[in-house]
Amino acid sequence: MLTIFAVSDSIGETAQQVAMAAASQFKDNAEVKRIPYVKSLEDVEDLMKTIEDCEACMIVSTIITVNVREYLTQKCIEKNINIINVLGPIINVASTILNKYPDYNPGAMWNTDETYYKRIEAMEFAMQYDDSKDYRGLKNADVVLVGLSRTSKTPLCMYLANKGIKAINIPLVPEVGVPEELYEIDKKKIFGLTINPLQLIEIRKRRLDKFHRISADIEYASDSRILEEFEFADKILRKIGCRTIDVTQRAIEDTALIIMEKLGVK
């Protein structure tokens, strides 16, 4: 088992994402451990003690502070530990092109500026109106997701919220219908989420197994019930006239990117 240590002098999310992207190519043969706030030479010493007993490991570093980064690199050379400095080469090239000295400010992208507060507001919005019967948020939403149960509406809303986009989701349930307000808003911000019926059946069956649901809940994953829901969803989406996205075998990140491109959001 390879252990990839994601090391940073900030929260370490960037290093972790890069490390996880690499680890995902090796399935069960690699794991990622995040080590944030390595800000001093003493922190580097503590880090080296932490990993000294690791038989197979490497470091993915996004440390910005030059002396700390160089010290960590030197220690890794001494210990024969592979290290990848992710941001260093990028910053150096950017500095050359811009003919400007970098700020070397750890965590600069997480500063509490307007973008940060917009993201927090969007997250609070998504949680407030998640899968609820309170549709007052429809008019204030940037995105409205409409789809059957288990089409990733909630996680997609939260992902979009992390990008500062206010998203609300409306579940399609034949017995409940949809709010009239849905027909009163701009259909350009409405996205219908569709999915292959066979995949939806499999997803719902796994969910039932996970929570040991029986009796009436079995209908939730039955062929007849899902056919009924698909017919209802098709009718509603046609009536709305909104754009649709097939989420079958599609990662949430991919679906979010499609939505953001349609909205013209970077």
From Swiss-Prot:
Signal peptide: none annotated. GO terms for molecular function: ADP binding; ATP binding; phosphotransferase activity, phosphate group as acceptor; protein serine/threonine kinase activity. It comes from the Bacteria. InterPro entries: Kinase-pyrophosphorylase, PPDK_reg. Keywords: Kinase, Nucleotide-binding, Serine/threonine-protein kinase, Transferase. It holds the Pfam family Kinase-PPPase. Its EC number is 2.7.11.32, 2.7.4.27. ADP binds at G147, L148, S149, R150, T151, S152, K153, T154. It catalyses: N(tele)-phospho-L-histidyl/L-threonyl-[pyruvate, phosphate dikinase] + ADP = N(tele)-phospho-L-histidyl/O-phospho-L-threonyl-[pyruvate, phosphate dikinase] + AMP + H(+); N(tele)-phospho-L-histidyl/O-phospho-L-threonyl-[pyruvate, phosphate dikinase] + phosphate + H(+) = N(tele)-phospho-L-histidyl/L-threonyl-[pyruvate, phosphate dikinase] + diphosphate. Bifunctional serine/threonine kinase and phosphorylase involved in the regulation of the pyruvate, phosphate dikinase (PPDK) by catalyzing its phosphorylation/dephosphorylation. Belongs to the pyruvate, phosphate/water dikinase regulatory protein family. PDRP subfamily. This is Putative pyruvate, phosphate dikinase regulatory protein. It comes from Clostridium perfringens (strain 13 / Type A). The lineage of its organism: Bacteria, Bacillati, Bacillota, Clostridia, Eubacteriales.
